[in-house]
Amino acid sequence: MDLNTILIIVGIVALVALIVHGLWSNRREKSKYFDKANKFDRTSLTSRSHTQEEMVQPNNISPNTYVENGHTPIPQPTTEKLPSEAELIDYRQSDKSVDDIKISIPNTQPIYDMGNHRSEPIQPTQPQYDMPTANNVASMTLEQLEAQSQNVGFNGINSSSPELRVQLAELSHEEHQVDYNLSFNEPKAETTAHPKQTTGYIQLYLIPKSSEEFNGAKLVQALENLGFILGKDEMYHRHLDLSVASPVLFSVANLEQPGTFNAYNLAEFNTIGIVLFMQLPSPGNNLANLRMMMRAAHTLAEDLQGVILTEEQEIFDANAEQAYLARV
């Protein structure tokens, strides 16, 4: 038999011995652990109970012990008898059901019962007092208050207070005072604020001043100078980043039906007017977008010699502009 075979056999035998030794050690440790867990250490229980008894402060003080000069009582601690080992509770034999445990307070009835049945908690009763209402007290005179203050059941108001007398005098004066002021139908200023518009459209119309129609070539040139791009639904749109991929802020439509611009005949068509409109809510800030649409309308009106009208077809002046801005 060669050396390699001998070494292999020796290694296998050593490995088997290690495994057997490990299993035997593990079983021995486990058996020791369970033996210790099943034992009841009465010595530790007795020492722990004695320690708790020693920590108790003496409560009984003899009232008959005095200092001769100061007549001050001297507390005399009384030693309490410690229970003997025979009186200790055997916890292994005192396993009681939780249902039999009751919590009670000395000199009172047991309130809490840990049993299966649940008793309703006792609601504390509060004394009720018959106090006069505020309206009755306010309507009383000084004589009535003084007469009622003598009543045993009413002691909540001090009629001698100067502040109360002043208030009652003012109240009595207001009740007997006659209002001679005549009310006239005077116009009242409207203070109700209009609600902000959050949906729908805001529109501005642009029509020519003198001529009957706008020239198509000039109109297209003016729109492209302001960054409008002909796109969806054959209308001109003002995008956020001046690119088709960005959101639309507001748009321009043709007043003539169907409201579109012919992409193949832009240089030869004429129109009676255009409409600028913004849909709410708009991308970003509605107020900033509305101001931008107003500036575009003013620029187009200057370039095309046109007039701006409101949605009610009235002149778009400074007052109308403020009303538009107040809507958003």
Swiss-Prot record:
Entry keywords, A to Z:
Cell cycle, Cell division, Cell inner membrane, Cell membrane, Membrane, Transmembrane, Transmembrane helix
- UniProt entry tagged with the keyword Calcium: no
User: Which superkingdom?
Assistant: Bacteria
Q: State where it is primarily located.
A: membrane
Q: Which Pfam families match?
A: ZipA_C
Question: Which biological process terms from the Gene Ontology are attached to this UniProt entry?
Answer: division septum assembly; FtsZ-dependent cytokinesis
Instruction: List all topological domains (Periplasmic).
Output: 1-4
Q: Region Disordered: what ranges?
A: 44-82
Which ranges are annotated Polar residues under compositional bias? Answer: 57-67
Ranges in the topological domain labelled Cytoplasmic: 26-328
Gene Ontology CC terms, in alphabetical order:
cell division site; plasma membrane
Q: Which InterPro entries match?
A: Cell_div_ZipA, ZipA_FtsZ-bd_C, ZipA_FtsZ-bd_C_sf
Q: Where are the transmembrane segments?
A: 5-25
Record localization: Cell inner membrane
Membrane-protein topology:
Single-pass type I membrane protein
| Free-text function comment from the UniProt entry | Essential cell division protein that stabilizes the FtsZ protofilaments by cross-linking them and that serves as a cytoplasmic membrane anchor for the Z ring. Also required for the recruitment to the septal ring of downstream cell division proteins.
- Record-linked HAMAP family: ZipA (MF_00509)
The record's comment on protein family reads:
Belongs to the ZipA family.
PANTHER family xref list: CELL DIVISION PROTEIN ZIPA
Subunit composition and interactions: Interacts with FtsZ via their C-terminal domains.
Q: What is this protein called?
A: Cell division protein ZipA
Source organism of the structure: Haemophilus influenzae (strain ATCC 51907 / DSM 11121 / KW20 / Rd)
Q: Which gene encodes it?
A: zipA
